[in-house]
Amino acid sequence: MDGIRRILVAVKEPAAKTLPAVRKAAELAKAFGAELVLFQSIALPLYLEGNVSYMNGGLADAERCTRDACERSLEAIACKLRRKGIEVCVSTQFDYPIYEAVIREATRLKVDLIVAEQHHGHHAASLLHLVDWELLRLSPIPVLLVKDPRAYRRPKVLAAVDPDHTYAKPVWLDREILNAGQEIARALHGSLHAVHAYVPIPALAFPTGAISEEDVETIHTRCREKANKKLKRALRDAEIRSSVAHVIGRHPADAIAEVASQIHSSLVVMGAISRSGFKRLLIGNTAERVLDRLSCDVLVIKPAHLVKKVPQKRRGAAHARLRLHPLIV
Protein backbone atom coordinates (compact mmCIF):
# COMPACT_ATOMS: atom_id res chain seq x y z
CA MET A 1 0.00 0.00 0.00
CA ASP A 2 1.42 3.32 -1.10
CA GLY A 3 -1.01 5.78 0.43
CA ILE A 4 -4.80 5.45 0.50
CA ARG A 5 -6.65 7.76 -1.88
CA ARG A 6 -9.91 5.91 -2.49
CA ILE A 7 -11.73 3.43 -0.23
CA LEU A 8 -14.67 1.22 -1.18
CA VAL A 9 -16.87 -0.03 1.64
CA ALA A 10 -19.24 -2.90 0.94
CA VAL A 11 -22.54 -2.00 2.60
CA LYS A 12 -24.55 -5.07 3.55
CA GLU A 13 -27.73 -3.49 4.91
CA PRO A 14 -27.99 0.32 4.59
CA ALA A 15 -30.99 0.39 6.95
CA ALA A 16 -29.15 -1.41 9.77
CA LYS A 17 -28.94 0.39 13.13
CA THR A 18 -25.16 0.14 13.18
CA LEU A 19 -22.78 0.10 10.24
CA PRO A 20 -19.36 -0.90 11.62
CA ALA A 21 -17.68 -1.17 8.21
CA VAL A 22 -18.94 2.26 7.13
CA ARG A 23 -17.81 3.75 10.43
CA LYS A 24 -14.31 2.31 10.18
CA ALA A 25 -14.00 3.21 6.49
CA ALA A 26 -15.07 6.78 7.28
CA GLU A 27 -12.43 7.02 10.01
CA LEU A 28 -9.74 5.94 7.57
CA ALA A 29 -11.04 8.23 4.81
CA LYS A 30 -10.96 11.18 7.20
CA ALA A 31 -7.47 10.31 8.44
CA PHE A 32 -6.00 9.84 4.95
CA GLY A 33 -8.05 12.51 3.18
CA ALA A 34 -9.35 9.77 0.89
CA GLU A 35 -12.53 9.52 -1.15
CA LEU A 36 -15.09 7.05 0.20
CA VAL A 37 -17.30 4.92 -2.05
CA LEU A 38 -20.42 3.36 -0.53
CA PHE A 39 -21.19 0.28 -2.61
CA GLN A 40 -24.07 -2.16 -2.47
CA SER A 41 -24.35 -5.24 -4.64
CA ILE A 42 -27.95 -6.15 -5.45
CA ALA A 43 -27.58 -9.90 -5.48
CA LEU A 44 -31.09 -11.05 -4.58
CA PRO A 45 -33.37 -12.06 -7.45
CA LEU A 46 -36.13 -9.73 -8.63
CA TYR A 47 -39.54 -11.35 -8.27
CA LEU A 48 -42.02 -10.35 -10.97
CA GLU A 49 -45.71 -11.05 -10.79
CA GLY A 50 -46.97 -13.58 -13.29
CA ASN A 51 -48.84 -11.00 -15.38
CA VAL A 52 -45.82 -8.69 -15.82
CA SER A 53 -44.29 -9.09 -19.25
CA TYR A 54 -40.54 -9.02 -19.83
CA MET A 55 -41.26 -7.23 -23.10
CA ASN A 56 -43.44 -4.32 -21.94
CA GLY A 57 -40.95 -2.65 -19.63
CA GLY A 58 -41.94 -4.45 -16.44
CA LEU A 59 -38.47 -5.87 -15.94
CA ALA A 60 -36.73 -2.54 -16.54
CA ASP A 61 -39.16 -0.81 -14.17
CA ALA A 62 -38.52 -3.38 -11.46
CA GLU A 63 -34.76 -3.01 -11.80
CA ARG A 64 -34.96 0.79 -11.79
CA CYS A 65 -37.19 0.92 -8.71
CA THR A 66 -34.96 -1.49 -6.82
CA ARG A 67 -31.81 0.38 -7.74
CA ASP A 68 -33.32 3.79 -6.90
CA ALA A 69 -34.36 2.54 -3.47
CA CYS A 70 -30.84 1.23 -2.77
CA GLU A 71 -29.24 4.48 -3.91
CA ARG A 72 -31.56 6.54 -1.69
CA SER A 73 -30.57 4.45 1.30
CA LEU A 74 -26.87 4.89 0.53
CA GLU A 75 -27.31 8.62 -0.08
CA ALA A 76 -28.87 9.02 3.36
CA ILE A 77 -25.68 7.57 4.85
CA ALA A 78 -23.47 9.62 2.53
CA CYS A 79 -25.13 12.91 3.53
CA LYS A 80 -24.21 12.36 7.18
CA LEU A 81 -20.60 11.60 6.27
CA ARG A 82 -20.30 14.63 3.98
CA ARG A 83 -21.25 16.86 6.89
CA LYS A 84 -18.10 15.55 8.59
CA GLY A 85 -15.99 16.76 5.69
CA ILE A 86 -15.58 13.39 3.96
CA GLU A 87 -15.83 13.14 0.18
CA VAL A 88 -18.40 10.41 -0.50
CA CYS A 89 -20.04 8.90 -3.56
CA VAL A 90 -22.47 5.98 -3.85
CA SER A 91 -22.68 3.06 -6.26
CA THR A 92 -25.10 0.17 -6.73
CA GLN A 93 -24.87 -2.68 -9.22
CA PHE A 94 -27.00 -5.70 -10.07
CA ASP A 95 -24.31 -8.34 -9.70
CA TYR A 96 -23.53 -11.59 -7.91
CA PRO A 97 -22.03 -13.39 -6.12
CA ILE A 98 -21.42 -10.59 -3.64
CA TYR A 99 -17.67 -11.10 -3.30
CA GLU A 100 -17.15 -11.00 -7.07
CA ALA A 101 -19.36 -7.92 -7.37
CA VAL A 102 -17.32 -6.08 -4.74
CA ILE A 103 -14.03 -6.98 -6.43
CA ARG A 104 -15.33 -5.97 -9.87
CA GLU A 105 -16.49 -2.56 -8.67
CA ALA A 106 -13.33 -1.95 -6.64
CA THR A 107 -11.19 -2.83 -9.66
CA ARG A 108 -13.27 -0.62 -11.96
CA LEU A 109 -12.95 2.36 -9.62
CA LYS A 110 -9.25 1.67 -8.94
CA VAL A 111 -9.62 1.83 -5.18
CA ASP A 112 -6.72 1.32 -2.79
CA LEU A 113 -8.63 -0.47 -0.04
CA ILE A 114 -11.80 -2.55 0.34
CA VAL A 115 -13.59 -2.45 3.70
CA ALA A 116 -16.17 -5.12 4.49
CA GLU A 117 -18.09 -6.14 7.58
CA GLN A 118 -17.73 -9.71 8.75
CA HIS A 119 -20.72 -11.88 7.91
CA HIS A 120 -22.34 -13.87 10.69
CA GLY A 121 -24.72 -16.77 10.90
CA HIS A 122 -22.47 -19.51 9.53
CA HIS A 123 -23.60 -22.98 10.55
CA ALA A 124 -20.21 -23.61 12.16
CA ALA A 125 -18.96 -20.83 14.41
CA SER A 126 -15.36 -21.90 13.90
CA LEU A 127 -15.47 -21.36 10.14
CA LEU A 128 -15.13 -18.08 8.30
CA HIS A 129 -18.21 -17.22 6.27
CA LEU A 130 -17.92 -18.17 2.59
CA VAL A 131 -18.47 -14.58 1.39
CA ASP A 132 -15.68 -13.24 3.63
CA TRP A 133 -13.31 -16.07 2.77
CA GLU A 134 -13.80 -15.75 -0.99
CA LEU A 135 -13.44 -11.96 -0.86
CA LEU A 136 -10.16 -12.29 1.02
CA ARG A 137 -8.95 -15.07 -1.26
CA LEU A 138 -9.83 -13.52 -4.62
CA SER A 139 -9.30 -9.80 -4.13
CA PRO A 140 -6.06 -8.38 -5.59
CA ILE A 141 -6.79 -5.24 -3.55
CA PRO A 142 -6.09 -5.14 0.22
CA VAL A 143 -9.21 -6.04 2.22
CA LEU A 144 -10.01 -4.77 5.71
CA LEU A 145 -12.41 -7.21 7.38
CA VAL A 146 -14.23 -5.41 10.21
CA LYS A 147 -14.88 -7.74 13.15
CA ASP A 148 -14.99 -5.25 16.04
CA PRO A 149 -17.71 -2.55 15.88
CA ARG A 150 -15.87 -0.18 18.22
CA ALA A 151 -14.22 2.93 16.78
CA TYR A 152 -10.44 3.18 16.55
CA ARG A 153 -8.95 4.99 19.56
CA ARG A 154 -5.19 5.35 19.17
CA PRO A 155 -5.16 1.76 17.91
CA LYS A 156 -2.41 -0.76 18.41
CA VAL A 157 -1.72 -2.14 14.95
CA LEU A 158 -0.08 -5.58 14.83
CA ALA A 159 1.84 -6.46 11.66
CA ALA A 160 2.33 -10.22 11.27
CA VAL A 161 5.43 -10.91 9.18
CA ASP A 162 7.22 -14.02 7.99
CA PRO A 163 10.93 -13.35 7.33
CA ASP A 164 11.36 -17.07 6.60
CA HIS A 165 9.03 -16.65 3.59
CA THR A 166 7.10 -19.82 4.32
CA TYR A 167 5.08 -21.28 1.43
CA ALA A 168 7.13 -19.26 -1.07
CA LYS A 169 5.71 -15.90 -0.04
CA PRO A 170 7.40 -13.05 -1.94
CA VAL A 171 10.24 -11.31 -0.10
CA TRP A 172 8.62 -7.89 -0.53
CA LEU A 173 5.34 -8.96 1.09
CA ASP A 174 6.70 -8.35 4.61
CA ARG A 175 7.70 -4.83 3.56
CA GLU A 176 4.17 -4.18 2.27
CA ILE A 177 2.65 -5.48 5.51
CA LEU A 178 4.92 -3.35 7.70
CA ASN A 179 4.46 -0.23 5.58
CA ALA A 180 0.68 -0.62 5.61
CA GLY A 181 0.68 -1.10 9.37
CA GLN A 182 2.87 1.94 9.88
CA GLU A 183 0.73 4.12 7.58
CA ILE A 184 -2.48 3.24 9.39
CA ALA A 185 -0.98 3.52 12.87
CA ARG A 186 0.45 6.93 12.03
CA ALA A 187 -2.76 8.22 10.40
CA LEU A 188 -4.90 7.11 13.36
CA HIS A 189 -2.36 8.29 15.97
CA GLY A 190 -1.78 4.74 17.14
CA SER A 191 1.27 2.52 17.57
CA LEU A 192 2.82 -0.26 15.51
CA HIS A 193 3.73 -3.71 16.78
CA ALA A 194 5.32 -6.50 14.74
CA VAL A 195 5.15 -10.24 15.39
CA HIS A 196 7.18 -13.09 13.90
CA ALA A 197 6.31 -16.68 14.77
CA TYR A 198 8.84 -19.46 14.46
CA VAL A 199 8.33 -23.15 15.17
CA PRO A 200 10.79 -24.35 17.85
CA ILE A 201 12.46 -27.73 17.49
CA PRO A 202 10.53 -30.19 19.71
CA ALA A 203 12.46 -32.30 22.21
CA LEU A 204 11.03 -35.43 20.58
CA ALA A 205 13.08 -34.61 17.49
CA PHE A 206 16.17 -35.87 19.30
CA PRO A 207 16.76 -39.55 20.20
CA THR A 208 16.35 -40.29 23.90
CA GLY A 209 19.62 -39.65 25.73
CA ALA A 210 21.36 -38.30 22.62
CA ILE A 211 21.28 -34.72 23.86
CA SER A 212 21.01 -33.12 27.29
CA GLU A 213 18.26 -30.77 28.43
CA GLU A 214 20.82 -27.97 28.56
CA ASP A 215 21.73 -28.56 24.92
CA VAL A 216 18.06 -28.55 23.93
CA GLU A 217 17.61 -25.24 25.74
CA THR A 218 20.68 -23.86 23.97
CA ILE A 219 19.25 -24.87 20.60
CA HIS A 220 15.93 -23.20 21.45
CA THR A 221 17.74 -20.03 22.51
CA ARG A 222 19.67 -19.94 19.24
CA CYS A 223 16.45 -20.45 17.26
CA ARG A 224 14.87 -17.55 19.09
CA GLU A 225 17.89 -15.31 18.57
CA LYS A 226 17.94 -16.17 14.87
CA ALA A 227 14.23 -15.38 14.56
CA ASN A 228 14.72 -12.12 16.43
CA LYS A 229 17.51 -11.07 14.05
CA LYS A 230 15.32 -11.85 11.05
CA LEU A 231 12.50 -9.71 12.42
CA LYS A 232 14.85 -6.81 13.14
CA ARG A 233 16.24 -7.09 9.61
CA ALA A 234 12.73 -7.03 8.17
CA LEU A 235 11.93 -3.90 10.19
CA ARG A 236 15.16 -2.27 9.07
CA ASP A 237 14.56 -3.14 5.41
CA ALA A 238 11.09 -1.59 5.63
CA GLU A 239 12.59 1.49 7.30
CA ILE A 240 10.42 1.04 10.38
CA ARG A 241 12.03 3.08 13.14
CA SER A 242 9.38 3.00 15.82
CA SER A 243 7.72 -0.31 16.67
CA VAL A 244 7.48 -3.01 19.32
CA ALA A 245 8.79 -6.41 18.20
CA HIS A 246 7.38 -9.76 19.37
CA VAL A 247 9.10 -13.08 18.60
CA ILE A 248 7.03 -16.12 19.55
CA GLY A 249 8.03 -19.79 19.30
CA ARG A 250 4.63 -21.17 18.32
CA HIS A 251 2.47 -21.92 15.31
CA PRO A 252 1.70 -18.63 13.47
CA ALA A 253 -2.05 -18.88 14.13
CA ASP A 254 -1.46 -19.29 17.86
CA ALA A 255 1.28 -16.66 18.06
CA ILE A 256 -0.64 -13.95 16.21
CA ALA A 257 -3.80 -14.53 18.25
CA GLU A 258 -1.81 -14.58 21.49
CA VAL A 259 0.02 -11.30 20.87
CA ALA A 260 -3.09 -9.57 19.51
CA SER A 261 -4.94 -10.48 22.70
CA GLN A 262 -2.07 -9.48 25.01
CA ILE A 263 -1.62 -6.00 23.54
CA HIS A 264 -5.37 -5.47 22.91
CA SER A 265 -4.75 -4.93 19.22
CA SER A 266 -7.42 -3.11 17.20
CA LEU A 267 -6.08 -4.27 13.86
CA VAL A 268 -3.90 -7.11 12.60
CA VAL A 269 -2.18 -6.70 9.24
CA MET A 270 -1.21 -9.98 7.62
CA GLY A 271 -0.23 -11.35 4.24
CA ALA A 272 -1.69 -14.26 2.33
CA ILE A 273 -1.11 -16.02 -0.95
CA SER A 274 -3.65 -17.80 -3.12
CA ARG A 275 -2.96 -21.30 -4.30
CA SER A 276 -4.99 -24.13 -5.75
CA GLY A 277 -5.48 -27.78 -4.94
CA PHE A 278 -3.64 -29.33 -2.00
CA LYS A 279 -1.46 -26.26 -1.39
CA ARG A 280 -4.56 -24.12 -1.11
CA LEU A 281 -5.96 -26.52 1.49
CA LEU A 282 -2.82 -26.32 3.63
CA ILE A 283 -2.28 -22.57 3.36
CA GLY A 284 -5.97 -21.76 3.61
CA ASN A 285 -6.25 -23.78 6.80
CA THR A 286 -3.49 -21.71 8.45
CA ALA A 287 -4.99 -18.40 7.32
CA GLU A 288 -8.47 -19.42 8.37
CA ARG A 289 -7.23 -20.44 11.81
CA VAL A 290 -5.72 -16.98 12.27
CA LEU A 291 -8.80 -15.13 11.05
CA ASP A 292 -11.24 -17.16 13.13
CA ARG A 293 -9.27 -16.72 16.35
CA LEU A 294 -8.98 -12.94 16.11
CA SER A 295 -11.68 -10.71 17.57
CA CYS A 296 -10.14 -7.54 16.16
CA ASP A 297 -10.18 -6.21 12.60
CA VAL A 298 -7.93 -7.85 10.01
CA LEU A 299 -6.26 -6.27 6.98
CA VAL A 300 -5.16 -8.86 4.42
CA ILE A 301 -2.58 -8.00 1.76
CA LYS A 302 -1.75 -10.34 -1.12
CA PRO A 303 0.52 -10.34 -4.17
CA ALA A 304 -1.89 -9.20 -6.90
CA HIS A 305 -0.16 -11.20 -9.63
CA LEU A 306 -0.76 -14.45 -7.73
CA VAL A 307 -4.50 -13.91 -7.38
CA LYS A 308 -6.97 -15.63 -9.69
CA LYS A 309 -8.70 -12.89 -11.68
CA VAL A 310 -12.42 -12.35 -11.28
CA PRO A 311 -14.31 -11.96 -14.61
CA GLN A 312 -14.72 -8.28 -15.47
CA LYS A 313 -18.23 -8.63 -16.89
CA ARG A 314 -21.07 -8.20 -14.40
CA ARG A 315 -23.65 -10.95 -14.14
CA GLY A 316 -26.56 -8.48 -13.99
CA ALA A 317 -29.85 -8.97 -12.17
CA ALA A 318 -31.19 -12.37 -11.26
CA HIS A 319 -34.87 -12.78 -12.11
CA ALA A 320 -37.62 -15.03 -10.88
CA ARG A 321 -41.26 -14.99 -11.90
CA LEU A 322 -43.73 -15.00 -9.04
CA ARG A 323 -46.91 -16.85 -9.97
CA LEU A 324 -49.98 -15.74 -8.06
CA HIS A 325 -52.66 -18.41 -7.72
CA PRO A 326 -56.24 -17.64 -6.65
CA LEU A 327 -57.07 -18.54 -3.09
CA ILE A 328 -59.42 -21.52 -2.96
CA VAL A 329 -61.50 -21.75 0.18
Question: Which stretches of residues belong to each language-model region?
Answer:
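A short acidic, glycine-rich active-site loop
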Residues: 57-72, 214-229
